[in-house]
């Protein structure tokens, strides 16, 4: 079968035509891939950075954001049928640890990821445990369903705390941060401020409903950034601080600024992964009585339920998809993603 694979321990991802068909077992589902989306993780693997070098076995079929159709299933599978449109949870868990047995599978200590630790979705076919497969409602397109993984990250991050009537600060306007703007606006946030250095994505954030989108590339240090944020807060009528912070960047200065401008009793969801150690003002956390929650992946499957329910209720995520390409043009897709001048890039395997 055709697949995109990491074949060498160097930058790049390569198309192959002779990847072996995956074999499915008693509790597995065989999925014919229709659409995939390129994730930031895929860029790390493409670029072969330090994280990838330490994590990714080679050779490896990459990719974990997908939509497809069930074409076969094991004899023990009753939850889906051949012909069902599906996406799937890319985190595979042990099912036996304390958290898994308590229904908190997103906290499994032994989590592994498709396209990272085991063969992934950038292929014509994917095998996945039936328990990880999620049926796509008829009203949701394959394109949108292929972005369920990052959208689920945004849902999990944003809905960890109440947003209705709250002032929300989002640091990082990548695709997940942009989705968080949509979610916060849909949930009735009062003011939404987002920060980034990417002018293209900051304009997308404004189009998505952000009250203010701040270009932080203009500021030399965290003190200047905090001063500018306080000016923005004053201009939009904020007399205290932000009630909820959604940290999507993993950047030290962004996190420090967020702590500075949070209201007392504020709540922070932290999704962004840092390339190194982070230094923060511990006193600000203590004396402001802040609540911090680390986010990894999606709650299985409450996040998926909330996500599809909100889409069916009218939350419009279509604008997050800015480019659609045939799989044969995957190199162009990766170049577009690397440029940052995009939202989500979809690769079509069905034509």
From Swiss-Prot:
The record marks 149 as: Important for catalytic activity for the proton relay mechanism but does not participate directly in the coordination of zinc atom. It is found in: Cytoplasm. PROSITE patterns: ADH_ZINC (PS00059). Pathway: Amino-acid degradation; L-threonine degradation via oxydo-reductase pathway; glycine from L-threonine: step 1/2. Belongs to the zinc-containing alcohol dehydrogenase family. NCBIfam families: PRK05396.1, tdh. Catalyzes the NAD(+)-dependent oxidation of L-threonine to 2-amino-3-ketobutyrate. HAMAP family: Thr_dehydrog (MF_00627). This is L-threonine 3-dehydrogenase. The gene is tdh.
């Amino acid at each position: 079968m055709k697949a995109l694979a990491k074949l060498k321990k160097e930058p790049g991802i390569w198309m192959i035509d002779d990847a072996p068909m995956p074999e499915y077992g008693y509790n597995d589902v065989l999925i014919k891939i229709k659409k995939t989306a390129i994730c930031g993780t895929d860029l790390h693997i493409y670029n072969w950075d330090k994280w990838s070098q330490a994590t990714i076995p080679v050779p490896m079929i990459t990719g974990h954001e997908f939509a497809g159709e069930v074409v076969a299933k094991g004899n023990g599978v009753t939850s889906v049928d051949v012909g069902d449109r599906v996406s799937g949870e890319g985190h595979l868990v042990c099912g036996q640890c304390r958290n898994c047995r308590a229904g908190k599978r997103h906290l499994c200590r032994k989590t592994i990821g498709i396209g990272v630790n085991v063969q992934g979705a950038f292929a014509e076919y994917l095998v996945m445990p039936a328990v990880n497969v999620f049926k796509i409602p008829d009203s949701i397109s394959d394109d949108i369903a292929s972005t369920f993984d990052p959208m689920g990250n945004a849902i999990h991050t944003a809905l960890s705390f109440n947003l209705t009537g709250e002032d929300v600060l989002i640091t990082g306007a990548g695709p997940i941060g942009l989705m968080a703007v949509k979610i916060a606006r849909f949930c009735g946030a009062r003011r939404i401020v987002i920060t980034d250095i990417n002018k293209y994505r900051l304009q997308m954030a404004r189009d998505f409903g952000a009250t203010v989108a701040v270009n932080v590339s203009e500021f030399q240090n965290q003190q200047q950034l905090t001063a500018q944020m306080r000016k923005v807060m004053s201009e939009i009528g904020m007399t205290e601080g932000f009630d909820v912070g959604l940290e999507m960047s993993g950047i030290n200065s962004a996190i420090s600024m967020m702590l500075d401008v949070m209201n007392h009793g504020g709540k922070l969801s932290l999704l962004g992964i840092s390339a190194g150690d982070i230094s923060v003002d511990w006193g600000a956390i203590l004396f402001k009585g802040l609540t911090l929650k680390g986010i990894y992946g999606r709650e299985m499957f409450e996040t998926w339920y909330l996500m599809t329910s909100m889409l069916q209720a009218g939350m419009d995520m279509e604008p997050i998809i800015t480019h659609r390409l045939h799989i044969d043009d995957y190199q162009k897709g990766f170049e577009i993603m690397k440029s940052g001048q995009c939202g989500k890039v979809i690769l079509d395997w069905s034509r």
